[in-house]
Amino acid sequence: MKPLENAYVIVMVTTPSKLEAERIAQHLLEERLIACANIIGPVSSLFHWSGKMEKTEEYLTLMKSRKDLFEKLSEAVKALHSYEVPEILAFPIVEGSKGYLDWLGSCLR
């Protein structure tokens, strides 16, 4: 099995509100840094911050992109995000239907 030639990724970002998630996704779509975004939530998040355990509701955004666009995508998210340290993670897409992956590639710069 050969890896995908274009190294597509799913990028995960959490935000404190649906509006912020939509604003970030809209900008990334306009810049063609992502092909699409799925906003899920609210979800419960538990984490350590400033020496304390925190619990909050967030919105989880899953975005489809290419690995070579991650640095630009990440910088754009940081510029628009309200968190001091936003969660921006990329996971490789190891397989996918040809039609979907062709569409995904056609949507990106």
Outline where the language-model segments fall.
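Positively charged, small/polar-rich N-terminal and surface patches that mediate targeting and assembly
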Residues: M1-R109
